[in-house]
Design a protein with these regions (language model features):
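Small-residue (G/A/S/T)-rich helix-start motifs and N-terminal tracts that mark the onset
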Residues: 1-74
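Conserved beta-alpha-beta core of the PfkB/ribokinase-like small-molecule kinase fold
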Residues: 77, 83-152
């Protein structure tokens, strides 16, 4: 059975993130290992939301998987909530990259030409660097504009 890591948030309402990715990937017959980046009450397009940062947990999850000898066929990212998390995700790529697998980055950071609440140009620049490590990137038009430094 194929096995994939998905690294993204859990949005409690909003038809996105791990609440959508996990059942879809599992329904395809792929074992899905999750690394939650944050727990949000709603996604960031809502006017009010809570954000529980899980940055501190991410390295220890990786360390346990290394000790257990887990191997993965792909790594797929979604919403990454902080600059520090981008560095941690990059470390996941280095640790678990399968030469016959894929790294897939959804640079979830913008819509309608604007960065999500809490993100700035430094975040967009660092996300662009992370995208350069991917085999496949899945930006929307706003994210593509930021990644390529093209006007929206």
């Amino acid at each position: 059975m194929k096995r994939i890591i998905t690294i993204q948030d859990i949005s409690c309402i909003g038809k996105c993130s791990l609440t959508v990715a996990l059942p879809i990937i599992s329904a395809m017959g792929v074992e899905t290992a999750i690394v939650p980046t944050a727990v949000l009450s709603t996604h960031t397009n809502f006017s009010n939301f809570t954000f529980r940062d899980l940055t501190e947990d991410m390295p220890s999850i990786k360390d346990v998987w290394v000790k257990e000898g887990f191997k993965f066929d792909a790594i797929y990212t979604g919403y990454i909530g902080t600059l520090e998390q981008i560095d941690i995700v990059s470390d996941y790529f280095k640790t678990f990259n399968n030469p016959h697998g894929y790294i897939i980055v959804d640079p979830a950071m913008a819509d309608n030409g604007k960065l999500y609440t809490g993100f700035d140009m430094a975040f967009a620049k660092k996300m662009t660097t992370l995208c350069s490590d991917a085999d496949i990137i899945l930006p929307n038009i706003s994210e593509a504009a930021f990644i390529t430094n093209t006007p929206y």
